[in-house]
A protein has these predicted regions:
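Polar, low-complexity export/assembly segments characteristic of proteins
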Residues: 2-18, 153-323, 327-330, 337, ...
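Generic serine detector
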Residues: 26, 40, 45-47, 90, ...
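Generic detector of bulky aromatic hydrophobic side chains
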Residues: 49-50, 112, 187-192, 204, ...
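Non-transmembrane, interaction-prone segments in cytosolic or luminal domains
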Residues: 50, 54, 58, 72, ...
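Mature, Sec-exported extracytoplasmic domains of Gram-positive
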Residues: 51, 62, 66-77, 82, ...
Length: 398
């Protein structure tokens, strides 16, 4: 990875930690990492995620489970939109401790029970006082849940955590409160890093759960004195060039592609089942036809979402490319400033050398002769002047 480039054995993009690479170089090193990471978000961090309703699963196909509403009418898959906050990493520790700070400054500590439900404890407000629950900004209590369903739709007053995907889903009322107050943060744990994963200390405020060392994310500009009272920044940090969400955006595109492939495989499975003697009955054939109709609609929806994912990805990649270009332009600007300073110092050095040469490399005998001649002229001028001033006005009266 270009982020791990080094110069003279020192990593370029890691601030003062020049002895540490930006990413984990091996699975062995990655396995040693265990961090509690804190991420703060604003309204711009909230994205829309498309999920499928009434989607068919592999279990539905095997069990010939046709999707129906409460009135017994067949329903077909559709697309819904949920509000998502994407964490910096996927596959965060599901059995770890989460801390969610809502837009009002209330903090909830959340762990996962053995049955998959959420255990919410220690809820305090911004003043440190214990309260019953988070609220949606209108006084309504907010529930917190865990989910493994990639198509999960939270309730209006619900926050859903998907640790596998590294996502926090916001219900409509929670989203509105977060958007209005422009504040939300999540603290989570991650211990299953892999080779190539980014070291979280380079991007986030976090705590090393192995050593207990706390890392506070801040600017680490390395400056050199290049002239009198003039300093120049000589490094570029990773977050100034590489966006950690580039990989997450690629994951979204891959998920959209894989979803389309999975649905096509499901369609092939149903078509194959229609030809089997086991499902030759009229009732089974009807169910398979109904499922096939739903799956074909689901495939069309998936293809549409895949196209939109690629279109969105192109825009995101252009933004990341622009960020890198801006970083390169900044480095180029600093190089020009350094070259200008170097040119000025070179000129000053030449001038001082010339002055030094004029003073130190002169012919001493010639200087003495010139000095003596100048002294004689000076003394003669003084003598002539003294004779002139000896006469007064009275010498000319008479």
């Amino acid at each position: 990875m270009q982020g791990d480039v080094d110069y003279a054995g020192r990593y370029v993009f890691t601030g003062f930690a020049t002895d540490r690479p930006l990413t984990y170089p091996s699975d062995v090193k990655a396995a040693e990492a265990d961090y509690t990471i804190t991420q703060s978000f604003d309204r711009e961090s909230i994205s829309e995620k498309k999920v499928y309703t009434n989607a068919y699963t592999n279990e539905d196909i095997i069990n010939l489970n046709v999707k129906k509403d409460t009135d017994g009418k067949i329903v077909t898959p559709n697309v819904a939109t949920v509000h998502r906050i994407q964490l910096g990493y996927s596959e965060v520790d599901a059995d770890g401790t989460f801390k969610i700070t809502d837009a009002s400054g209330n903090v909830a500590t959340v762990t996962k029970n053995d049955d998959g439900t959420a255990n919410v404890t220690g809820i305090v407000n911004a003043n440190g006082e214990t309260i019953d629950s988070l609220d949606d900004g209108s006084g309504n209590p907010v529930s917190i849940t865990f989910t493994t369903d990639s198509n999960y739709i939270p309730g209006d007053d619900e926050i859903a955590i998907n640790s596998q995907l590294g996502e926090v889903l916001l219900g409509e009322n929670v989203y509105n409160n977060t958007y209005t107050n422009n504040s939300f943060s999540v603290q989570y744990e991650k211990s299953n890093f892999k080779k190539g994963d980014v070291d979280p200390t380079m991007y986030f405020t976090c705590v090393d759960n192995v050593t207990g060392i706390s890392y506070v994310k801040k600017s680490e500009d390395i400056e050199y004195n290049v002239n009198f009272t003039q300093k120049l920044k000589v490094n570029t940090q990773a977050d100034e060039s590489f966006d950690i969400y580039l990989g997450r955006n690629v994951d979204d595109i891959m998920a959209a592609v894989q979803n389309t492939i999975d649905i096509e495989n499901q369609i092939s499975k149903v078509e194959s089942m229609k030809k089997e003697e086991k499902y030759a009955g009229t009732d089974d054939q009807k169910k398979l036809d109904d499922m096939l109709e739903g799956l074909n609609k689901q495939k069309n929806l998936a293809k549409d979402q895949m196209t939109k994912a690629f279109e969105k990805g192109i825009g995101q990649m252009q933004e990341y490319q622009e960020k890198i270009s801006n970083a390169k332009a900044d480095v180029g600007n600093r190089i020009q400033r350094l070259d200008l300073t170097k040119t000025r110092l070179t000129e000053q050095k030449t001038n001082f050398k010339s002055l030094k040469s004029q003073n130190e490399d002169i012919d001493l005998e010639e200087v003495v002769v010139n000095y003596t001649a100048a002294q004689l002229v000076y003394n003669a001028a003084l003598s002539a002047a003294s004779k002139v001033v000896q006469q007064t006005l009275l010498d000319f009266i008479g």
